[in-house]
Curated annotation (Swiss-Prot):
GTP binds at residues 7-14, 57-61, 112-115. Belongs to the TRAFAC class translation factor GTPase superfamily. Classic translation factor GTPase family. SelB subfamily. The keyword Nucleotide-binding applies. Its main location: cytoplasm. The lineage of its organism: Bacteria, Pseudomonadati, Pseudomonadota, Gammaproteobacteria, Enterobacterales. CDD domains: SelB (cd04171), SelB_II (cd03696), selB_III (cd15491). Residues 57-60 are annotated as: G3. One of its GO terms (molecular function) is selenocysteine insertion sequence binding. Keywords: Cytoplasm, GTP-binding, Nucleotide-binding, Protein biosynthesis. Residues 112-115 are annotated as: G4. The gene is selB. This is Selenocysteine-specific elongation factor. One of its GO terms (cellular component) is cytoplasm. Residues 35-39 are annotated as: G2.
Length: 614
């Protein structure tokens, strides 16, 4: 459990922590000299039962507020300190505002230096503090009157702090730690410290270090200042890491991550909680975990807005950010991440804003996935990063019925039905426009119907429609069940002359027309009708094989694929006993219809179900 102190400068935060834990959290010589916390200090309070509550002593001076903001990410509780001699001060209010804007952690209040004033002043400050607590939504906070130097109120405060519940951290989330310090230890090497926002880490794990963008191995761990083999979210962690990185390359705001991250984000949609109204395209200081950048805000509708960062940030859904004015003097608002990497255009369309509002209301990973699926296919890798879900978390999520998955893409049933309707409409239009053709191949149908959608999902839907009988297939050509063709009387007569001439070799239209004494265009239309009926197949325009020969060729390709792992033109030519040009025409036909796919000079078996096996 981590507890962050908060409060105005010189109100006794560090002294109070020393009285609780016996540790002086000021770690810099300048801090000890000035009696003022400048950077983050840490103190740990080991208990007989093995628990080790940890304290982050954050600076109270306005000048060092960015350091304070680096300390409040990922905390379970906060301890607000108000001196009885000063009462509520500027940073008291600002720290309360920041705590409110970073997720409302459970709050405890200590009134310090009670030995320096009379009881009337203590009562006055107590009333003052309760009023400001109500103002910022912390009316339920427990309040203790203390004097650290003489021990007043310390036993009751310690007992209360030990009874605070620890926040539950879900096991299905990936490990993510924001680095706030890096140093070297003689005999151990590089050590980084920070607060884990999610997940679990073990000695021996490989983690990705942003900044240097390299993998690092965890050699040793300390959690809450104790050596351990495993550490979890919500703990203060020191990691001894090994890899190709030096201390000087690591900065506050870098991350250690369980997985290789996507590119950091320059734009996000957020839900705002404002203390001071923001203006369109207002420049801001933006704080996230241990990171601090500048950027601007684009207001959308109600409390939704887009943040645009001058320096990209690694963010995830529901991450909290604090927005301060460009002079870095006033805290203006908090922001919760609703969507990563939004589209550059169309964000102000009413239907899109309505969808964003639904996404902002999502209470769980399952809710968020359901909302995303309303708009179309979801990339599972992107979603897993956004929600910081590990493999276990994603598997649990995908067990819900009604999802259609192909590779790393997911679709829900209503959108799949819309896509299938589009596929059928496209096929009907194709038949209307090409009455003398059997139909398009799978790839061509995909490109005509849904060219911008995920390829694997569209092909999977086409296959499901073929299996269900909504679409029929003849040797790679797809058509609607009622799309049938018949010969006219003239074509029937031509076909009766042409059919006996089809042996094992292919025919060109012009050669067959000449052989039978038929007009070339009439022969061309007749052979197209024969192809539409599944009797013959054109491997290229105007060159036809009997369909049983096409099936034989498909079986040859299967055999070569089993023997060699693929089919090349030379092997196929030798197996078939034809010229290289014809062999290539046949192989390219199989590529076009999706039975094979080309990779360099090889043709790999892609869809073995298109043709019956021998």
């Amino acid at each position: 459990m981590i507890i962050a102190t908060a409060g105005h400068v010189d109100h006794g935060k560090t002294t109070l922590l020393q009285a609780i834990t016996g540790v002086n959290a000021d770690r810099l010589p300048e801090e000890k000299k000035r009696g003022m916390t400048i950077d983050l200090g840490y103190a740990y309070w080991p208990q007989p039962d093995g628990r080790v509550p940890g304290f982050i002593d954050v600076p109270g001076h306005e000048k060092f507020l960015s350091n304070m903001l680096a300390g409040v990410g990922g905390i379970d509780h906060a301890l607000l300190v108000v001196a009885c001699d000063d009462g509520v001060m500027a940073q008291t209010r600002e720290h309360l505002a920041i705590l409110q804007l970073t997720g409302n952690p459970m709050l405890t209040v200590a009134l310090t230096k009670a030995d320096r004033v009379d009881e009337a002043r203590v009562d006055e400050v107590e009333r003052q503090v309760k009023e400001v607590l109500r103002e910022y939504g912390f009316a339920e906070a427990k309040l203790f009157i203390t004097a650290a130097t003489e021990g007043r109120g310390m036993d009751a405060l310690r007992e209360h702090l030990l009874q605070l519940p620890e926040r539950e951290h879900a096991s299905q989330h990936s490990f993510r730690l924001a680095i706030d310090r890096a140093f070297t230890v003689k005999g151990a090497g590089l050590v980084v410290t920070g607060t884990a926002l999610s997940g679990e880490v073990k000695v021996g794990d490989s983690l990705w270090l942003t900044g240097v963008n390299k993998p690092m191995r965890v050699r040793a761990l300390h959690a809450q200042n104790q050596p351990t083999e495993t550490a979890n979210a919500g703990q203060r962690i020191a990691l001894n890491i090994a890899g190709d990185a030096e201390k000087e390359q690591i900065n506050r705001g870098d991350w250690l991550l369980a997985d290789v991250p996507p590119e950091p984000f320059t734009r996000v949609i957020v839900e705002l909680q404002t203390h001071t109204p923001l203006t369109q395209w207002q420049p801001l200081h933006i704080h996230h975990a241990a990171s601090h950048v500048t950027g601007r805000v684009s207001l959308l509708e109600d409390n939704l807005a887009e943040l645009v960062f001058d320096t990209p940030l690694w963010l995830a859904d529901n991450d909290r950010l604090v927005l301060r004015d460009i002079s870095a003097r006033n805290t203006l608002a908090g922001a919760r991440v609703v969507m990563l990497n939004p589209p550059r255009r169309g964000k102000r369309k009413p239907e899109y804003l309505q969808w964003l509002a639904s996404l902002a209301r999502a209470q769980s990973d399952a809710d968020a996935l359901s909302v995303h699926l309303e708009r179309g296919a979801v990339n599972l890798a992107d979603f897993a990063w956004a929600r910081q879900l590990n493999g276990e978390g994603m598997r649990e999520l995908l067990q819900q019925p009604g999802y259609i998955q192909a590779g790393y893409s997911l679709l829900n049933a209503p959108v799949a039905a819309r896509w299938q309707r589009k596929i059928l409409d496209t096929l009907a239009t194709y038949h209307e426009q090409h009455r003398d053709e059997p139909g398009p191949g799978r790839e061509r149908l995909r490109r005509m119907a849904l060219p911008m959608e995920d390829e694997a999902l569209v092909l999977l839907l086409i296959e499901k429609m073929r299996e269900s009988g909504d679409i029929h297939s003849h040797h790679g050509w797809l058509h609607l069940p009622d799309h049938k063709a018949g010969f006219s009387e003239e074509q029937q007569a031509i076909w009766q002359k042409a059919e006996p001439l089809f042996g094992d070799e292919p025919w060109w239209v012009r050669d067959l027309a000449k052989e039978t004494g038929t007009d070339e265009q009439a022969m061309r239309l007749t052979l197209r009708q024969a192809a539409q009926q599944g009797i013959i197949t054109a491997i290229v325009k105007d060159r036809y094989y009997r369909n049983d020969r096409i099936v034989e060729f498909a079986n040859m390709i299967r055999d070569l694929d089993q023997e060699c792992g693929s089919t090349c033109a030379a092997d196929f030519r030798d197996r078939l006993g034809v010229g290289r040009k014809l062999a290539i025409q046949i192989l390219e036909y199989f590529d076009r219809i999706g039975f094979t796919r080309r990779r360099g000079n090889d043709h790999l078996l892609r869809d073995a179900l298109l043709f019956p096996e021998k």
